[in-house]
């Protein structure tokens, strides 16, 4: 009997020891895998294996979407035309400072072969267009080659593109830098014919807001106010365009005033732009690929492909942000208010009052914030 107990005791001891060895081995293996995974992740943060190569490449500055002061994550456009144009997808938002950082850094980056600019699909306010145009001009002034192309040029896109060394246009394109316009609908006669009575209370001479309900045309005061705003803006814009293109003062104004006559004589808008010196070359999509291959051959030696290039945000990732980790007890808080002010949260094109109030309260409660800028 004692011999049987001894055998079972030995077997039990062996199984127990074996189980401990297996469990400990598996545990150790799991810990080793986790440890190496963590070390590998940390190491990848400091290695340059994913470093963006910019040597002899063309910075491809072709943002599509809209320029904003501050991106609203996960928010699409509420503009019907934008939704239709984008096929229902959310509109891509590009922060102005990111675009300026890319262009300003490219101006002194000797590794880049050139900068290609195409902003024909980028929506922006005039103030943003002026800043981007100045950044492109700075690149050209630093003797870095800048090539601009678009199928069609609007006021803003031509302002930016005109600062390039070479301006190209599609053979079916047109420069539509005709100046500013403003259109309003007036309902006074409509309501009168529909026999709808309403009351509008106004005070002051320059109160044009309710004019669509009180007039059937633009008032002289409204015309005066608009011209006081638009004329200096247009003069600055045409001045930058004409200086960059070495055009005689008044060329753009004459083009805008008489474009319909010019197009009557020659319906090819691209040819008219070339004759006036607004552009340097008319190209098809195939021709621009071939032309750029001659200027900047790609590694694959494919003359039908665009040159070796680096995108905006890949290039942005190579720029060191010197402000990272810098702490200050004297800060200036900037709160951006873009779009129509309504109740609720901020969304693209909507300045939600709840979010604005929360941001203001957060700034006032931060002792390190010494001033507040409300950018509307």
Regions found by a protein language model. Give the residues of each.
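Short acidic-hydrophobic, aromatic-tinged amphipathic segments that line or gate anion-handling sites
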Residues: 168-169, 279-285
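Small-residue-centered hinge/linker elements
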Residues: 2-262, 293-376
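Extended, domain-scale alpha-helical bundle/helix-rich regions
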Residues: 265-268
């Amino acid at each position: 009997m004692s011999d049987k107990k001894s055998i079972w005791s030995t077997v039990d001891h062996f199984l127990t020891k074996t189980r401990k060895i297996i469990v400990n081995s598996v545990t150790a293996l799991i810990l080793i895998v986790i440890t190496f995974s963590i070390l590998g992740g940390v190491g990848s943060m400091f290695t340059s294996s994913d470093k963006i190569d910019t040597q002899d490449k063309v910075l491809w500055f072709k943002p599509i979407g809209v320029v904003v002061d501050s991106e609203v994550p996960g928010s699409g456009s509420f503009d019907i035309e934008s939704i239709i144009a984008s096929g229902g997808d959310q509109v891509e938002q590009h922060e102005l400072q990111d675009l300026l950082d890319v262009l300003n850094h490219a101006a002194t980056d000797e590794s880049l072969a050139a900068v290609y600019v195409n902003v024909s699909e980028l929506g922006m306010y005039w103030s943003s267009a002026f800043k981007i145009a100045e950044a492109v001009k700075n690149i050209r002034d630093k003797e870095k080659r800048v090539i601009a192309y678009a199928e069609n040029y609007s006021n803003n896109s031509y302002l930016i593109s005109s600062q390039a060394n070479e301006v190209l246009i599609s053979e079916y394109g047109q420069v539509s830098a005709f100046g500013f316009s403003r259109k309003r609908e007036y309902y006074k006669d409509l309501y009168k014919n529909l026999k709808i009575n309403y009351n509008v209370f106004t005070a002051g001479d320059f109160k044009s807001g309710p004019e669509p309900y009180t007039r059937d045309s633009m008032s002289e005061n409204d015309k005066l106010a608009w011209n006081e705003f638009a004329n200096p803006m247009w003069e600055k814009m045409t001045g930058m365009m004409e200086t960059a293109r070495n055009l005689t003062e008044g060329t753009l104004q004459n083009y805008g005033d008489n474009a319909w006559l010019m197009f009557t004589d020659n319906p090819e808008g691209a040819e008219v732009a070339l004759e006036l010196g607004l552009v340097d070359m008319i190209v098809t999509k195939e021709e621009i690929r071939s032309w750029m291959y001659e200027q900047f051959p790609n590694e694959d030696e494919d003359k039908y492909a665009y040159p070796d290039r680096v995108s905006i945000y890949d290039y942005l990732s190579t720029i060191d942000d010197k402000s990272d980790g810098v702490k200050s007890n004297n800060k200036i808080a900037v709160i951006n208010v873009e779009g129509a002010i309504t109740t609720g949260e901020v969304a693209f094109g909507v300045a939600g009052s709840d979010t604005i109030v929360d941001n203001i309260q957060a700034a006032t409660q931060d002792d390190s914030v010494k001033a507040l800028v409300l950018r509307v």
